[in-house]
A protein has these predicted regions:
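Extracytoplasmic/lumenal domain signature
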Residues: 1-269
Length: 269
């Protein structure tokens, strides 16, 4: 957990019984408004911590509390970073208030940056499309972006929507065709669904009465073989029941990629 008060610029790690993990909290001297991402970078069997801060930095803190590296961007990082294992490399990715999306190597070097048209508050997510890793993120400019591991636009992307993208993009095979659909929400109260080529799925967008305020969560709630899409608005929780068979297994289908909320995802290529 990252601290955001003037006197609490620390990262906290807490055991299940409420006690501090040995060596924590660690004073990093930077305010952290969003969550962290976890992955064992030094292969010692203990997760390390990636965080973004209001000091414009994306940083890696090792499990012993040592700051391993820090990369300076052009403005505040107010989205939780994500760690994407492509099978060939580890990427650390996050959006910034300087309108740019950054992906770094596991050593903290810049792999690429991508300039959008507004602030990026959504955490990135990833999926395998056509045998390659695809990285998705949204911006306050209303666009959903999809890039490859070198920062190039994927065919059919970006897609402009009618409102700012307010949560991370999620993926599931909602129509049982063997390929993932791209699910998102925006500040115009729209639930959106796209194919991998950027074409919109039938019956979407579905418009709610109030703006959406978070990331979709997709799973088969009632065990009937089709999927439900859970979305939160500024007023209510909405559940959309898909009427064809589908699966969310193996996809980034929930906030931070998994039920442990680690922000880590391994793409099978």
């Amino acid at each position: 957990i990252g601290g955001y008060s003037s006197s609490g610029k620390k990262i906290y790690a807490i055991n299940a019984d409420g006690t501090n993990v040995s060596g924590f909290p660690v004073d990093v001297g930077e305010k952290i408004i969003k969550g962290v991402a976890l992955y064992d970078f030094n292969n010692n069997g203990i997760d390390d911590i990636v965080f973004g801060s209001d000091s414009d930095n994306i940083s890696l803190l090792l499990d012993d509390g040592t700051l391993h590296w820090s990369y300076s961007t052009g403005d505040k990082i107010q989205s939780a970073p994500s760690i994407i294992n492509t099978g060939n490399e580890i990427l650390v990715c996050a959006g910034s208030k300087d309108y740019s999306f950054y992906c770094l190597t596991e050593d903290g070097d810049l792999k690429f940056s991508y300039l959008s048209e507004n602030n990026i508050y959504t955490s990135p997510s990833a999926v395998e499309l056509n045998g390659s890793t695809a990285i998705f993120f949204g911006s306050d400019d209303g666009n959903i972006y999809a890039v490859d591991v070198n920062g190039n636009n994927l065919p059919g992307w970006p897609q402009q929507t009618d409102g700012n993208i307010v949560g991370s993009i999620a993926f599931s095979d909602i129509d049982n065709d063997g390929t993932p659909e791209i699910i998102s929400t925006n500040g115009a109260g729209q639930l959106l669904s796209y194919n991998g080529d950027g074409s919109q799925n039938q019956y979407f967008p579905i418009t709610a009465e109030f703006p959406y305020a978070g990331s979709p969560h997709i799973f088969d709630l009632d065990g009937d073989g089709d999927l439900e899409i859970f979305t939160g608005s500024t007023n209510t929780l909405i559940v959309t029941d898909m009427k064809s068979a589908g699966t969310s297994d193996g996809y980034w289908s929930t906030y931070r990629g998994n039920d442990k909320r680690t922000g880590y995802y391994e793409v099978s290529e």
